[in-house]
Amino acid sequence: MSAVIAPRPTSRFSLRNELAAAGAIAARDVTKLLRDPIRLVGGLVFPALFIGVLGGAFASNFESPGIDLLPFIFAGQLAQGVWQSAALGLISILEDRENDFSQEIFVAPIGRRTILAGKILGESLVAFPQAFTVMLFGIVLGIPLTAAQVVALIPALVLIAIFGASFGALVVSLLPNQRSANLLFPFIFLPQFFLAGAFNPIRDLPWYLDIVSHIAPLRYAVDLIRGAYYGVPNVAVLSDPIWNVSLISILTVVMLSIGTLLFVRSERNR
């Protein structure tokens, strides 16, 4: 009598299903942006006005040896805008947890890591319209921006978008609800705008502020974008771009690993 071989059960958690789910979550975040005109216009106009008003005021009233402040602030705002947009976007995962959408996504047959990966991908994509708007406005203001610089900036922007989203994932994984995130995030981001050198040179900071500046993740995102923009050794660039890429990559992996672990654990305990 021949043995009956039972068919191998198919896994509900196949790689294809997980990738499709992550893509759907990312597409949902992009669609939400397109359907929210206030958020879309604010995200596009505010950085441009920041460069035009703040950059113009700084360039007219302050001098820094060897640094043209308008391109300096342009590169800083480009980095800060993408990094902050990607990081802040992760707050939406707390919103999803609290509304009806959570009943659909958090009980779906997909891994919690897939949910987080989809949110990170989606918010990274959402950050790019702002980046291209800043570039276009920079050209309008007469800031030099060549095709070679754009080619160098795009991969750097991709990296810092993922870097920012990973930072946001780590912070969000430690918070219980959206209200806590809305209260905490301004205290995390606002000091970094100045300590990271997004708007001002930071080579001559007092020693205690210099220590805090080196702890700020945004510092390395800003410096990487300036390295890609200037393309050659420049007084505006603090560290070698290769060093910044290496450090950002390591920090991204560490923050993403810890954030994912904490997020999965918190969801299991709910």
What would you call each of these model-derived segments?
Residues S2-F46:
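Aromatic- and glycine-rich beta-strand/loop motifs that create alpha-glucan
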Residues P37-I38, L70-P71, R113, R179, ...:
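Residues that define the loop-to-transmembrane-helix transition and helix capping
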Residues A24, R28-K32, D100-V107, P176, ...:
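Short amphipathic alpha-helical coupling elements at transmembrane boundaries
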Residues S2-R8, Y229-V235, V245-R270:
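Junction motif at the cytosolic side of a transmembrane helix
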Residues L49-L54, L69-L141, F187:
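Hydrophobic alpha-helical transmembrane segments of multi-pass membrane transport proteins
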Residues S64, P144, F193-V254:
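Membrane-interfacial helix-loop-helix junctions in multi-pass membrane proteins
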Residues R112-Q192, A236-S249, V253-T260:
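Alpha-helical transmembrane segments and their short interhelical loops
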Residues L54-E63, G138-T146, L175-N177, F199-D204, ...:
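Short helix-capping/hinge motifs at transmembrane helix termini and TM-loop junctions
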